[in-house]
Amino acid sequence: AVCVSLLGASSIRPLPLHLGQFNNMIKCTIPGSTPWWDFSDYGCYCGYGGSGTPVDQLDRCCQTHDNCYTEAQKFSGCSPYRRKYSYECSEGTLTCKSDNDECAAFVCNCDRLAAICFAGAPYNSNNVDIDLEARCQ
């Protein structure tokens, strides 16, 4: 069983630094969660890409986050998927630090608002790994 576990773990791609930060922001607002597993294949917008009508409130959080990243890309040289930023988590409260440049501050705020949104949205396991072609038009 240990070998299977180790082999399974070796096939998981590591998160880029910034997405690791987003992952940790979600853990701050939802203690005990496993964001990469819980949200990476949820609804029409949580995970890579996105299209159609969000299936619920949580999926709308992801759509808003996607749109925020699109806005971040309008800053010269700003790549939200790779941008490192400074933030603080204190007792479930997220704060983007003032030493971030314009791009980092924007991306940090995208992630902060999404993490807060996730924490306030119900999680419906029926919306995990859905048929994107049928439900996301």
Swiss-Prot record:
Ca(2+) binds at residues 45, 47, 49, 66. GO terms for molecular function: calcium ion binding; calcium-dependent phospholipase A2 activity; phospholipid binding; toxin activity. SMART domains: PA2c. Binds 1 Ca(2+) ion. GO terms for cellular component: extracellular region. The keyword Lipid metabolism applies. It is an enzyme of class 3 (hydrolase). Its main location: secreted. Its EC number is 3.1.1.4. It is found in: Secreted. Disulfide bonds join 28-89, 44-136, 46-62, 61-117, 68-110, 78-103, 96-108. GO terms for biological process: arachidonate secretion; lipid catabolic process; phospholipid metabolic process. Snake venom phospholipase A2 (PLA2) that may act in the hemostasis system of the prey. Exhibits hydrolytic activities, and prefers the anionic micelles (dPPC with deoxycholate) (54 umol/mg/min) to the zwitterionic micelles (dPPC with Triton X-100) (15 umol/mg/min). PLA2 catalyzes the calcium-dependent hydrolysis of the 2-acyl groups in 3-sn-phosphoglycerides. Belongs to the phospholipase A2 family. Group I subfamily. D49 sub-subfamily. This is Acidic phospholipase A2 PL-II. It comes from Walterinnesia aegyptia. The lineage of its organism: Eukaryota, Metazoa, Chordata, Craniata, Vertebrata.
